Amino acid sequence: MKPFLRQQLARYTDRLGELEFLLSREDIMQDMKQFLLLSREHTEVGAVASRWARYQQLEADLSGAQELLRGSVDDPDMTAMAQEEIDNASAELQKLENELQRMLLPKDPDDARNAFVEIRAGTGGDESALFAADLLRMYTRYCERRGWKAEIISESPSELGGYKEVVIKIEGDHVYGALKFESGGHRVQRVPVTETQGRIHTSACTVAVLAEPDEAVAIQINPADLRIDTYRASGAGGQHINKTDSAVRITHLPTGIVAECQDGRSQHSNKAQALKVLTARIHEKDRSERAAKDAAERKGLIGSGDRSDRIRTYNFPQGRLTDHRINLTLYKLLTIMEGDLDDVVQALQAFEAAQQLAALELGAGA
């Protein structure tokens, strides 16, 4: 284990002792708010400190087993026993080190949240809209694999069965943490269904993944800053699908951010969903501005998540998916399009963790 990690972990042991002393004080016990705050920290710090103590004990066990091995060259049974202890301790040490590294990394408070995923057709006309539908299918299939719930919040269908734009809400465990790296430009290379000469075309869609904010964040929006318009919901080609003004469009006047919803059964439900999407977009705007500032200071991690960033290419003739941010290439495009995204998601998460660990080491040496 690297020295800087040992230094960080030693601080957890020290802090645990401080917290145990504070929680034993009568004045703290009488202040319920402070007591709960310190108790929560005690639980988090204790989880790290206990693993660090176990790691140190294993190091001592490993050292003892290695000493035993050196002194038992003439005893095959003792040699075998010592080697088994060495193998077991080494394996558990590596597992614990990986756990401790993950626990030391800075946590994104939004990772555990639900998310909105917006998919917009870009360059490529009808083919781009069809690819937007393929991306929607890919994400919904991935949700099924993860046991998440996905529902369409807003959609603008195209003439050929694709989408000019579609927004889905995904509910489940750590949705945003898994999907946040999907934000950006997705390029597809294939022969479109509308192509009669068999030529490969290139088109693109943009994806934005927004964490669903707390209700408290939504409450902070001043109603006076909102303009709410109602209109008739329509299907593909503008065909009206009902005769009441049930669709809702909400504009946040200070930022110009707009959200609309027409898929609910009533104006009330559409307004509620549109407000949630609007809040998520405002939250994401603030977040992306902070991320851009942080990236300028530390050269960025995986990328800004800006729609203009081309993050990935889907090459159907070669069966290839390439994520340009981490130089990941997989030749299993068809299974990925059926929702088998785990290899991609895990590679991006591992890359972020490695970058964060490097930043942590750099900060420790500063």
Curated annotation (Swiss-Prot):
<comment type="function">
    <text>Peptide chain release factor 1 directs the termination of translation in response to the peptide chain termination codons UAG and UAA.</text>
</comment>
<dbReference type="InterPro" id="IPR050057">
    <property type="entry name" value="Prokaryotic/Mito_RF"/>
</dbReference>
<feature type="modified residue" description="N5-methylglutamine">
    <location>
        <position position="239"/>
    </location>
</feature>
<keyword id="KW-0648">Protein biosynthesis</keyword>
<dbReference type="GO" id="GO:0016149">
    <property type="term" value="F:translation release factor activity, codon specific"/>
</dbReference>
<dbReference type="GO" id="GO:0005737">
    <property type="term" value="C:cytoplasm"/>
</dbReference>
<comment type="similarity">
    <text>Belongs to the prokaryotic/mitochondrial release factor family.</text>
</comment>
<dbReference type="InterPro" id="IPR005139">
    <property type="entry name" value="PCRF"/>
</dbReference>
<dbReference type="Pfam" id="PF00472">
    <property type="entry name" value="RF-1"/>
</dbReference>
<dbReference type="Pfam" id="PF03462">
    <property type="entry name" value="PCRF"/>
</dbReference>
<keyword id="KW-0488">Methylation</keyword>
<dbReference type="InterPro" id="IPR004373">
    <property type="entry name" value="RF-1"/>
</dbReference>
<dbReference type="InterPro" id="IPR045853">
    <property type="entry name" value="Pep_chain_release_fac_I_sf"/>
</dbReference>
<dbReference type="InterPro" id="IPR000352">
    <property type="entry name" value="Pep_chain_release_fac_I"/>
</dbReference>
<protein>
    <recommendedName>
        <fullName>Peptide chain release factor 1</fullName>
    </recommendedName>
</protein>
<keyword id="KW-0963">Cytoplasm</keyword>
